[in-house]
């Protein structure tokens, strides 16, 4: 809505039609912002600026985790802090399980992608220099600090992360928690 431009609002999971995620903001804007940027760039900018206004909280989260850059939360509350609950109900198994979805670090990549897509759609270099570029750089710094070099393969890997399937937080029979390189 055009009214969003005046608000400090993000794109909540499931839009406005479900209570399952309590209005938290995830990465769902990655699916809609590229189109919004082409049709109503002022709304796209406002929604990405929502993330920019929470950049200091994301930097603090990265620092607390011993990382550089900006660590955006998987479930962001209104102030930008991580709001992922400790337990998750699995409707397939009918059991509660630990909710490790806070390991879904790709939310930052979605934010950086949306910032770049907004710039490409609008050509707004001033916005990119003042806000969008800062988001892109800080997310890049985070992933550079997450990556570890494997000298045996001469490749970089990211361990302990989780893909977008919140019910599968690790590969079967693998040591440790999370996934390697966001793959199953």
State where each predicted segment sits:
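Acidic/histidine-rich catalytic neighborhood
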Residues: 142-184
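Short, glycine/acidic-rich hinge or "gate" loops at secondary-structure transitions
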Residues: 6-12, 63-65, 127-131, 148-159
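Conserved positions within tetratricopeptide repeat
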Residues: 45-48, 129, 137
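Structured mid-domain segments that build the active-site/substrate or prosthetic-cofactor binding neighborhood
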Residues: 110, 117, 136-146
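Substrate-binding groove/exosite segments of carbohydrate-active enzymes
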Residues: 1-123
